[in-house]
């Protein structure tokens, strides 16, 4: 079973933040898979699981997960899910924002994440390894927007604006197409 986890913060306040691009990707992936395989999905709506403190869509082949902890505690939910379902780390994909990659770009890499990402550090700490797949979604655009001096933490909690929204939507479509191949 493949597990694709989108990292983000719960609540409407954070819904369109750069930090929530992981949630955006798994939501778009769920929508695409629902269209491609309508009979295969047991329940295509994200359902809250108290056991894992996460919203989950489950099929026989995969789980889509949105931890409902805040970003910096994402590892708690991920570790519980991996233990419960006996997930091999080679089947785990963590989708997250990445300030080391320019907006409009992404990388899917095994065992390699950004220099600093507290949500990812939480996952690594709780799993005791970094040997899983990282779907690194580029959100860096500070120089173009004239925000070069804005700290990463502040910048990542800001919403996408203007043309960034169009760029992100296009990038999410590409990522989803790659992830469909992973779970198919």
Regions found by a protein language model. Give the residues of each.
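Phosphate- and other anionic-substrate recognition elements at nucleic-acid/protein interfaces
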Residues: 114
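Hydrophobic secondary-structure segments that place a key small or acidic residue at a functional site
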Residues: 117
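Nucleotide and nucleotide-moiety/phosphate-recognizing core
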Residues: 2-111, 121, 125, 131-136, ...
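Intrinsically disordered, low-complexity regions enriched in acidic/Ser/Thr/Pro/Gln residues
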Residues: 156-159
């Amino acid at each position: 079973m493949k597990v694709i986890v989108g990292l983000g913060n719960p609540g409407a306040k954070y819904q369109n933040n750069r930090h929530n691009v992981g949630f955006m990707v798994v939501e778009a992936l769920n929508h695409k898979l629902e269209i491609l395989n309508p009979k295969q999905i047991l329940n295509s709506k994200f359902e809250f699981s108290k056991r894992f403190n996460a919203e989950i869509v489950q099929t026989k082949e995969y789980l889509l997960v949105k931890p409902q902890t805040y970003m910096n505690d994402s590892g708690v939910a991920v570790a519980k899910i991996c233990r419960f379902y006996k997930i091999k780390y080679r089947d785990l994909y963590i989708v997250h924002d990445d300030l080391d990659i320019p907006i409009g770009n992404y990388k899917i890499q095994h065992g390699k994440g950004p220099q600093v990402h507290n949500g990812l550090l939480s996952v690594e700490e709780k799993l005791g390894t970094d040997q899983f797949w990282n779907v690194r979604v580029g959100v860096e655009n500070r120089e173009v927007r004239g925000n070069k001096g804005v700290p990463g933490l502040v910048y990542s909690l800001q919403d996408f604006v203007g043309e960034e929204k169009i760029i992100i939507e296009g990038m999410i479509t590409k990522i989803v197409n790659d992830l469909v191949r992973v779970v198919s």
